[in-house]
């Protein structure tokens, strides 16, 4: 994709790598599908970096503006389906 991910320059390099992987997983859920456990593990790591609901909503809004993909909707879908299933939006 030809856009910039929302990143906070206060995050460590490791946290930035984790966030990019998480954004890529959300894209994958929309474009091809992703195994639920893979997405949920990245979401858990995302929540360690961004524990605040307000910050999570801000990042989701910024990501949706540049990509057209909703983090919230993808995670809600993942929570609704059974383990070992594909999350596809």
From Swiss-Prot:
Entry-linked InterPro entries? BH2638-like_sf, UPF0223
The record's listing under Gene3D superfamilies reads:
BH2638-like (1.10.220.80)
The Swiss-Prot or TrEMBL record describes its family as follows: Belongs to the UPF0223 family.
Q: Which HAMAP family match?
A: UPF0223 (MF_01041)
What is the name of this protein?
Answer: UPF0223 protein BCA_4066
Native species = Bacillus cereus (strain 03BB102)
